[in-house]
């Protein structure tokens, strides 16, 4: 029966597609196939002429032809929206009427709608950036409707998961519990990320100097490419806020372990990106601010420096949200220690970058290496103090490691380029810090000893 259905459809498709007068009706022909199978299905059901296998096979053919008819007859966002509507309605019927087959059919259709949405977004890479207005385009509307559709499906899934039947473990339920939230989270993240990118692409296109009476300008200088650097920083900041917010939402409302761990892992990867690629981009803007931007025709202002605080604020928020979520989701003490060390590394990274930035702006580029050595030494002292106060041995060990790295950097890299007076000042400062650390260890040795025994 199934083979006959596809053979009939294949011959019909070939006839319609080869005739220029009929090819516009391909979608209707496909929908007609769905109607025929629905009539057969109704007849089988009313007369009870076959077993459940034939019934569900015919039902599957009905939805298959409906699903195929949509992209054949329509294009663009309409395909995505109709697949979302079809999948959502099927899932709703399956859940509310307790018809599991509808629920199972809906999942691949929802997956197709997501792939169609990705295709819609990819098409916009070939459109003139001036034709796309951020947060005011068909892609954004489609994304919002997709979020609402997937959100409704996730809501239904969570609402009905409390019944005893659905609490039983099965591969389908296990896949569904991850698959549906993943669709929702990815769609929400990518929808707003794309709009931020569209905004900066529009700004870049508007910066064009084409048609302006400027002599001796090459193709590269036609655009203000510093805008791309701003875009990268804003996208990293958005990612940090999004996944930090997801971790916080999970902590306060959902308390889902899989979602929590996913938010933590992706958040940590984004933090790594912020403190490597993000810092590199901040360095590009700092250089542009000091040296006049990508070329002389574009304005350079203090926003080139201030944008760094958007990134660092996002880093701080993500760290705070991940830390709160981790205390609830992950009971492993070693991971808590790891996360605390990530926080201290981030703080030290921020302070070091601030020091380099402002010394560079002030014109003290020659001594920022020395400034970093002093900063790291002071921070190691703070870590020792905090480790003693909080009775955390790993903080004290980390402080000593940091101090050792600072000494190695000083003697192998910094001190050779310093004058005699500068060398004397640095060695005195480091000596004082060593004395303070030794004093703290001696003063609180009983407290440290009690901690070791414990």
Task: State the predicted function of each range.
Residues 1-454:
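Alpha-helical transmembrane segments of multi-pass membrane proteins
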């Amino acid at each position: 029966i199934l083979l006959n259905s596809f053979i009939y459809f294949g011959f019909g498709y070939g006839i319609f597609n080869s005739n220029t007068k009929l090819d516009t009706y391909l979608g209707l022909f496909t929908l007609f196939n769905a109607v025929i199978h629905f009539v057969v299905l109704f007849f089988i059901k009313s007369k009870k002429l076959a077993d459940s296998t034939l019934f569900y096979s015919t039902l599957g053919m009905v939805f298959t032809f409906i699903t195929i008819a949509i992209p054949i007859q329509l294009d663009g966002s309409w395909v995505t929206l109709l697949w979302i509507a079809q999948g959502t309605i099927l899932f709703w019927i399956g859940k509310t009427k307790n018809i599991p087959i509808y629920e199972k059919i809906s999942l691949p259709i929802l997956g197709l709608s997501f792939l169609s949405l990705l295709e819609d977004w990819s098409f916009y890479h070939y459109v003139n950036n001036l034709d796309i207005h951020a947060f005011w385009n068909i892609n954004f509307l489609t994304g919002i409707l997709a979020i609402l559709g997937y959100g409704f499906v996730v809501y239904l899934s969570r609402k009905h998961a409390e019944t005893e039947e659905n609490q039983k473990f099965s591969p389908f339920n296990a896949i569904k519990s991850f698959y549906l939230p993943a669709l929702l989270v990815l769609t929400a993240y990518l929808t707003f990320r794309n709009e931020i990118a569209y905004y900066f692409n529009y700004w870049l296109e508007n910066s064009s100097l084409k048609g302006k009476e400027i002599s001796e300008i090459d193709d590269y200088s036609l655009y203000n490419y510093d805008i791309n650097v701003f875009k990268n920083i804003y996208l990293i900041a958005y990612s940090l806020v999004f996944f930090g917010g997801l971790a916080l939402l999970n902590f306060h409302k959902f308390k889902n372990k899989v979602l929590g761990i996913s938010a933590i892992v992706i958040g940590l990867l984004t933090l790594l990106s912020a403190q490597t690629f993000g810092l590199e981009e901040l360095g590009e803007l700092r250089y542009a601010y000091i040296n006049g931007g990508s070329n002389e025709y574009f304005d350079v202002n203090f926003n080139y420096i201030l944008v760094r605080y958007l990134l660092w604020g996002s880093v701080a928020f993500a760290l705070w949200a991940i830390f709160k979520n981790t205390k609830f989701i992950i009971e492993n003490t070693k991971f808590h220690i790891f996360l605390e060390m990530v926080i201290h590394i981030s703080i030290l990274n921020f302070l070091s970058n601030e020091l380099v930035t402002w010394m560079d702006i002030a014109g003290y580029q020659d001594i920022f290496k020395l400034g970093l050595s002093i900063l790291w030494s002071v921070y190691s002292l703070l870590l020792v103090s905090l480790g003693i106060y909080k009775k955390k041995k790993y903080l004290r060990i980390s402080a000593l490691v940091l101090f050792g790295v600072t000494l190695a950097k000083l003697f192998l890299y910094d001190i050779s380029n310093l004058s005699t007076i500068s060398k004397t000042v640095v060695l005195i400062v480091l000596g004082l810090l060593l004395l303070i650390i030794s004093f703290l260890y001696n003063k609180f040795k009983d407290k440290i000893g009690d901690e070791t025994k414990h």
